[in-house]
Curated annotation (Swiss-Prot):
Biological processes per GO annotation: isopentenyl diphosphate biosynthetic process, methylerythritol 4-phosphate pathway; terpenoid biosynthetic process
Binding positions (ATP): 93-103
Enzyme class: transferase
Keywords assigned by UniProt, alphabetized: ATP-binding, Isoprene biosynthesis, Kinase, Nucleotide-binding, Transferase
Gene3D superfamilies, per the entry: 3.30.230.10, GHMP kinase, C-terminal domain
Keyword Kinase: yes
Record's protein name: 4-diphosphocytidyl-2-C-methyl-D-erythritol kinase
UniProt-listed HAMAP family: IspE
Length: 285
């Protein structure tokens, strides 16, 4: 019987790059804010051990799809003889800095761990997920979080029940190109914050490089900064190319959305502190 699971988007409320590591990753500090804007994964368990994608983004080859990689990683790690047919409905823009691929992989791991009854703990799933991508663990953690390390050292954080207008300029920014760019800003690490209200002097160290690579990001930010009733300045999520405004009410966010140029994709979404997969994740801690 098919089982359907949600994979939420995230935004980075800020992103400070602290240090380039010997493994070519970067130490960073950020807040991952989960959103109620989701991809939808449907799993059908099989007895033949075969893992395949039955529908989804055809522009991504099956063997390169993170949901397939995640399923095969869990299968190999646990030794299960079960298989799965996986179908994904993509809503989260690809290559926009919203973590869609990582979230899909995380939901795949959590879902199949439950459906295959492989009994891995959340910590084990997070370790397995880290091999698939630095952002995968936070989606298995299943809570909005203060993050350090390469984004894998996580502490839950409660954020306000605000709304966001997210704009995707329909252009992909290469994370690898951002982090290898000569102009990437490095910030001094801040002390760990105890609550959201302690955020001061935050920014996104990737922003100026992203604008150098794709000037339209700057244009989108300028547009968002003309919106009424926004909370603070418009920001970029992750390494881009999505930018966003924060609002106290859905009404204000929807009013701003009506003025977004039609050439860009946009959506209004709400901040959530717990992921839709939170209950399954905590059951396996």
């Amino acid at each position: 019987m098919p089982s359907t699971w949600l994979a939420p988007a995230k935004i980075n409320l800020f992103l400070h790059i602290n240090k380039r590591r010997k493994d070519n990753y970067h130490n960073l500090q950020t807040i991952f804010q989960l959103l109620d804007y989701c991809d939808k994964l449907t799993c059908t368990i099989t007895n033949n051990g075969v893992i395949k994608r039955t529908s989804g983004n055809k522009s991504v080859k099956q063997d390169q799809d993170l949901i397939i990689k995640a399923a095969k990683a869990l299968q190999q790690y646990t030794g299960t003889t079960l298989g799965a047919n996986l179908s994904i409905v993509k809503n989260i823009p690809i290559g926009g800095g919203l973590g869609g691929g990582s979230s899909d992989a995380a939901t795949t791991l959590v879902a199949l761990n439950q459906l295959w009854d492989t009994k891995l703990t959340q910590a084990q799933l997070m370790k397995l997920g880290l091999n698939l991508g630095a952002d995968v663990p936070v989606f298995i953690f299943a809570q909005s979080a203060w993050a350090e390390g390469i984004g894998n050292i996580l502490s839950p954080i409660k954020t306000p029940d605000h709304y966001f207008l997210v704009v995707f300029i329909n252009k992909h920014i290469s994370t690898k190109e951002i982090f290898s760019h000569y102009a990437l800003t490095i910030s001094e690490p801040q002390g760990k914050i105890a609550n959201f209200s302690e955020l001061v002097n935050t920014h996104n160290d990737c922003l100026q490089v992203a604008i150098k690579l794709e000037a339209e990001i700057g244009v989108a930010l300028e547009h968002l900064n003309t919106c009424y009733n926004r909370v603070g300045q418009a920001r970029m999520s992750g390494t881009g190319s999505c930018v966003f405004n924060e609002f106290l009410t859905e009404k204000d966010a929807l009013a701003a959305a009506k003025k977004v140029p039609k050439k860009w994709m946009s959506f209004v979404t709400r901040a959530i502190n717990n992921s839709p997969i939170y209950n399954w994740a905590v059951a396996k801690r």
